[in-house]
Amino acid sequence: MSFPDITPDLKAAMPSLRGRLLGNEPLAPLTWFRVGGPAQALFTPADEDDLGYFLSRLPTEVPMLCIGVGSNLIVRDGGLPGVVIRLAPRGFGDTRADGEIVYAGAAALDKRVAETAAAAKLGGLEFYFGIPGTVGGALRMNAGANGRETKDALIDATAFDRSGNRRVLGNADMQFSYRHSGADPALIFTSARFRGTPASPDAIRAKMNEVQAHRELAQPVREKTGGSTFKNPPDNSAWKLIDAAGCRGLRVGGAQVSEMHCNFLINTSDATAADIETLGETVRERVKAQSGIELQWEIKRIGVAVDAAR
């Protein structure tokens, strides 16, 4: 599927644009599942000023969405109308430590945040070492692991609104809850500051090694996957409910529930986005029938659905 090319009109309205603006750009290569259709327009800003300029000139009727490295994302097969904004490491991937504060651009990998803190002998951010994704995604969904979440370390975050205005949100402004931020969904986060705690380098490294070892042992890290598919219900584990419902190894088309960890869906070879989403909905139905519990998606699903699963 392809969309009418809107990039000539956008470029004409933005003569000072420095970033890259492409029409009908495939999104599948930008996601861990490697599925999905194109973006009607894909914009990669050069830096914060370029992003603010683009947003200030973007017509309000044009849909807009920001993505990261696509580690927690299903792009549907029909693609996304409007503009998809993707922050690149070159302009938004810096990390550094200053005293007990760790600064990170929104395109920095979560793992890099943990490494930067460790190099500065700061603990409290080791949990990021095992989270696949970027700081921007961590802010949007209050990413966490091993008993800690983004809300436990965040000082503040910088973002741009739909009109191109720069804003700074404190921890309370983020309205964090389990795997969710109540901040305006139209905001595009560009950086964040985290507070670390001075700690022994050996102790920090030991925690990071433990996080990595657990992930390697328990999760299908070498598959085309998207991380944890469903949120854990209160006082329960999604994977246990999925296993009890007999869904381990279940397949739809080229999509499969992981044998290693059944809260992970994997693209075994040639899955479509429809295969993966249909498999997820089948799992939800079976869990509801078996336990009465309705699982909630943790993976974000975006775009236009066009093909039924095979």
Swiss-Prot record:
What top-level branch of life does the organism fall under?
Bacteria
Q: Where in the cell is it found?
A: Cytoplasm
Q: Which family does it belong to?
A: Belongs to the MurB family.
User: Record's Gene3D superfamilies?
Assistant: 3.30.465.10, UDP-N-acetylenolpyruvoylglucosamine reductase, C-terminal domain, Uridine Diphospho-n-acetylenolpyruvylglucosamine Reductase, domain 2
Q: Which residues form the active site?
A: 179, 228 (proton donor), 298
Q: Which UniProt keywords apply?
A: Cell cycle, Cell division, Cell shape, Cell wall biogenesis/degradation, Cytoplasm, FAD, Flavoprotein, NADP, Oxidoreductase, Peptidoglycan synthesis
Required co-factors: FAD
Q: Which species is listed as the source? A: Rhodopseudomonas palustris (strain BisB5)
Name assigned to this protein: UDP-N-acetylenolpyruvoylglucosamine reductase
Q: Which residues form the FAD-binding PCMH-type domain?
A: 35-199
Cysteines paired by S-S bonds: none
Pfam families for the chain: FAD_binding_4, MurB_C
Query: Quick one: where is this thing mainly located?
Result: cytoplasm
